[in-house]
UniProtKB/Swiss-Prot annotation:
Known function: GTPase that plays an essential role in the late steps of ribosome biogenesis.
Residue positions binding GTP 2: 203-210, 250-254, 314-317
Quaternary structure, from the entry: Associates with the 50S ribosomal subunit.
Pfam families to which the protein is assigned, alphabetical: KH_dom-like, MMR_HSR1
Family from the record: Belongs to the TRAFAC class TrmE-Era-EngA-EngB-Septin-like GTPase superfamily. EngA (Der) GTPase family.
A GO molecular-function annotation: GTP binding
Organism: Campylobacter lari (strain RM2100 / D67 / ATCC BAA-1060)
Protein name listed in UniProt: GTPase Der
Gene label: der
């Protein structure tokens, strides 16, 4: 697919134009210079033609971090087909802007000079100052007021192939409704794309999430720096691994409460958004620095969203911890609510054991989407209740008529009972353990609900 890159100095409106063309808020926008530090990508439709739109980090050399951002942006421009070079029409052009623009022209690609923030006649007069850039394709636009954008898109359309969007290309996100048929005793399972796995990368600031993403995709996709909070936007990247598409979302670092301000607060919300759209969470911990309460709170996000979970001990090569003791601490103490999660030690910077993590993602996804045959499930429940009978409810007999798995990702099991409210949480935990012993649900939450026969009302646990 052909690509269009938005490039220019910080705070010229690249992310605002990106959001406008994407028709939704994806990139974080702010008056603070340098808000976008990574490249965001999304498929868009330009005059009925498919294109990959890329929002790059600002071109700036004021410090080491922004030099890295600039290098990433220039690399993305070299791999793009069309360049929108954006400038701020509220200011007169400077030599730095001109130098960056000429650097883009050397790539010999279709390039447009896009002068943003042209909101009135006075701004339009000022835009003539950019004529010395020596480019034919100049577009005065105002993203805020949606002026001039159609003309820009029509120009770009001339360089795009006639590859029209099909309705089948758009994913169907219709809400799923659980249907229980009393007569058949069957539930309607949601459809899962078994060849596309969505993975969220979570963890507190500077534990190595961006380095891990780069190691996983073998490309410097996210800007990596020792400066805490380098990544602001969630950065999506997809790879193929053993014939499966794995889509990663590198979420913004999560700061301690009380220190979250402005962009960080919005980025924290974006972390929640990323997990809402993920199936598996990689909980990244800093093995060299050790673990703290904030790690536990972040882990709770994965539990809250009922995702598959893999605990990743990053920087293990710099750690002096004993693996068995660390595993015991994680499973029995700090993260006992994620006792089902496998623990993988890696070094993101060196790439050591990253291949093990990729294989584990496939395994956990298979567990996340597996369906237990109803006959086998009922045989297991019958044996479990015989070995450990259900407690009576104030002298009344409590009975499970049958069990059925009614959903995937995560797996959910319904127990059809005469007195569903009488099922104690400890007995649910007992049944969960029995199911895990017989079926491989490593890395996956297992949800059990109790329902009265002939009713959709449930008691979940």
């Amino acid at each position: 697919m052909q690509s269009i890159i938005l490039i220019g100095k910080p705070n010229v409106g690249k992310s605002s134009l990106f959001n406008r063309l994407a028709r939704k808020r994806i990139a974080i926008t702010s008056d603070i210079s340098g808000t976008t530090r990574d490249t965001n990508k999304i498929e868009v439709q330009i005059d009925g033609k498919k294109a990959l739109l890329i929002d790059s980090g600002g071109l700036d050399e004021s410090n080491e971090l922004f030099k890295n951002v600039k290098a990433n942006s220039l690399k993305a421009a070299k791999n793009s087909d069309i360049i929108f070079y954006m400038v701020d029409g509220k200011f007169l052009p400077d030599d730095e802007d001109k130098a960056f623009f000429y650097e883009m022209k050397k790539l010999n690609k279709p390039i447009a000079l896009v002068i943003n923030k042209i909101d009135n006649k006075k701004d339009e007069e000022r835009s003539w100052e950019f004529s010395n850039f020596g480019v034919k394709e100049v577009f005065n636009i105002s993203v805020t007021h949606n002026i001039g954008i159609d003309e820009l898109c029509m120009w770009a359309s001339k360089f795009l192939n006639e590859n029209f969007l099909d309705a089948d290309d758009e994913e169907d996100f219709e809400s799923y409704l659980e249907n229980f048929d009393e007569n058949s005793g069957d539930f309607k399972l949601k459809t899962i794309n078994e060849n596309h796995i969505k993975v969220g990368i979570i963890g507190r600031v500077n534990v190595g999430k961006s380095s891990l993403l780069n190691a996983l995709v073998k490309e410097e996709r996210s800007v990596v720096s020792d400066i805490a909070g380098t990544t602001i936007d969630p950065v999506n990247e997809s790879i193929m691994h053993k014939d499966k598409i794995i889509e990663f979302v590198d979420t913004a670092g999560i700061r301690k409460r009380g220190k979250i301000q402005g962009l960080e607060r919005y980025a924290l919300n974006r972390t929640e958004y990323a997990l809402t759209n993920a199936q598996i969470a990689l909980l990244v911990l800093d093995a060299a620095e050790g673990f703290n309460e904030l790690d536990e709170r972040i882990a709770g996000l994965a539990a809250k969203h009922c995702l598959g979970v893999i605990i990743v001990l990053n920087k293990w090569d710099k750690s002096e911890l004993d693996f068995d003791k660390t595993l015991k601490e994680l499973k029995l103490d700090r993260f006992k609510f994620l006792a089902y999660a496998p623990v993988i030690s890696v070094s993101a910077l060196s790439g050591k054991r990253v291949h093990v993590l990729l294989d584990k993602i496939l395994e956990v996804f298979a567990n996340f989407t597996q369906k237990i045959p109803t006959a086998k499930l009922n045989a297991l429940v019958e044996e479990a209740t015989r070995a450990h009978p259900l407690p009576h409810d104030y002298g009344k007999l409590v009975k499970i008529y049958y069990a059925v798995q009614y959903d995937l990702a995560p797996p959910k099991i319904a127990l059809i009972m005469n007195r569903p409210k009488a099922l104690h949480f400890s007995y649910k935990r007992y049944l969960q353990n029995q199911i895990r012993k017989q079926f491989n649900f490593e890395g996956v939450p297992l949800i059990i609900v109790s329902r009265k026969k002939g009713s959709k009302d449930e008691q979940e646990g």
